[in-house]
Amino acid sequence: MYNKITPPTTGEKITFKNGEPVVPDNPIIPFIRGDGTGIDIWPATEKVLDAAVAKAYQGKRKISWFKVYAGDEACDLYGTYQYLPEDTLTAIREYGVAIKGPLTTPVGGGIRSLNVALRQIFDLYACVRPCRYYAGTPSPHKNPEKLDVIVYRENTEDIYLGIEWKQGSEIGDRLISILNKELIPATPEHGKKQIPLDSGIGIKPISKTGSQRLVRRAIKHALTLPKDKQQVTLVHKGNIMKYTEGAFRDWGYELATSEFRQETVTERESWILSNKEKNPNISLEDNARQIDPGFDALTPEKKAQIVKEVETVLNSIWESHGNGKWKEKVLVNDRIADSIFQQIQTRPDEYSILATMNLNGDYLSDAAAAIVGGLGMGPGANIGDSCAVFEATHGTAPKHAGLDRINPGSVILSGVMMLEYMGWQEAADLIKKGLSDAIANSQVTYDLARLLEPPVEPLKCSEFADAIIKHFG
């Protein structure tokens, strides 16, 4: 089956049922060490994960690690430009769950990004990025502890799909010509809304299937959270891109109010129900007026539409959601993308799960990570219905490779996500406690140590791993 790698002789495969992992007590898990500082951070991560599993389960559970290759290390073994060998793809497909360090961006043609390639090959449609603050972590924000969100980013669509042509290419010029002449010609009504002939051009596909499976997974996650965190916010720019980002929002609401009707309430529904609870005799029109402050300035047709919305909500879900019962449901709302960038800074404790498309999610997850301490502490997972890959969210930092100084927190916390995904919560909790206590005691690597006041003597990467284990208790 494999050309240059050999699986462990002990251990079992993780399988999947209805999109969820079925995990044996001794799973085989492929790992990619990673390029650059992967040589430092992976050994530290493996040591912490193994120690947590051993302590939590007293030998009843154990991970059998399976070394596979990608990036520069793969080229060293498999040959030039073999950044993502078939052996590695076969192993991840066979064993279902994998973890990896940072990977270099390939030079030359072919694969544009190894991370994107893995997501597309295995249909890992949900990029999951928790952003929470660990006490003692230096942050430029006054109250970083108020931010505790999970970004659910659609991973396989949007402009990141990579369907684009450079300026001057034959196909690009042809496409622009067809669009200008046949689909968006200048008209007296709309004027000249055309693409300049010297443009590069890309395509932004957003599908109903892709949008709804992402929102479905986000809502399922929300249902596992404490009641005060059961909220999913659909982040979009639908006010401008109505048929892509606006459709994402609409499809998200459609999924929530059909497939999860008894478990969810939309923000507008909550307003309608609350108005009725505060004033049982409120008229449909007055209820509509309260949920839409500009109601009286609307056209008669628009007024009738909102009144009908109020009537439909009360007739359909008052019995199941009224009299305060909606407060026990997962709240589904939406926010414009540029607004949410402000609100995670000014009103961070109002949000929990942020579900969004690929490009917005890339920006948003990095911005949120910066608030709580940066990408060095930012974990990530790419999850599909029959595979999951957990990863460092930072780059390879080759100038620090082999110096035993880089912060392994991102990969360690990605390992925590992996353990939680597997249902091994006890081991995950040990690591979170150990990491939190180490940071609170200023036992940190150089990237955090230099920002503390007063500065402290930094730990090596390997020493930070030892400190985490020591604080398991």
From Swiss-Prot:
Residues annotated as binding NADP(+): 104, 394-400, 407, 446, 450
An individual GO BP term: glyoxylate cycle
Sites annotated Critical for catalysis: 160, 237
Binding site for Mg(2+): 362
Gene3D superfamilies per the UniProt record, alphabetical: Isopropylmalate Dehydrogenase (3.40.718.10)
Binding site for D-threo-isocitrate: 113, 115, 119, 129, 153
Record's keyword terms, sorted: Glyoxylate bypass, Magnesium, Manganese, Metal-binding, NADP, Oxidoreductase, Tricarboxylic acid cycle
Keyword DNA repair: no
Catalysed reaction, written as an equation: D-threo-isocitrate + NADP(+) = 2-oxoglutarate + CO2 + NADPH
Cofactor or coenzyme needed: Mg(2+); Mn(2+)
Consequences of knocking out this gene: Essential, it cannot be deleted.
Gene Ontology MF terms: isocitrate dehydrogenase (NADP+) activity; magnesium ion binding; NAD binding
Known EC number: 1.1.1.42
Activity regulation behaviour: Inhibited by either oxaloacetate or glyoxylate. Also inhibited by the adenine nucleotides AMP, ADP and ATP and by NADPH, which inhibits the activity by 28% when it is added to the assay mixture at 0.25 mM.
UniProt cross-references to Pfam families, sorted A to Z: Iso_dh
Cofactor detail note: Binds 1 Mg(2+) or Mn(2+) ion per subunit. Mn(2+) is the most effective divalent cation in vitro, but the enzyme can also use Mg(2+), Co(2+) and Ni(2+), with lower efficiency.
Function: Catalyzes the oxidative decarboxylation of isocitrate to 2-oxoglutarate and carbon dioxide with the concomitant reduction of NADP(+).
PANTHER family: ISOCITRATE DEHYDROGENASE [NADP] (PTHR43504:SF1)
Protein family: Belongs to the isocitrate and isopropylmalate dehydrogenases family.
Name this protein carries in UniProt: Isocitrate dehydrogenase [NADP]
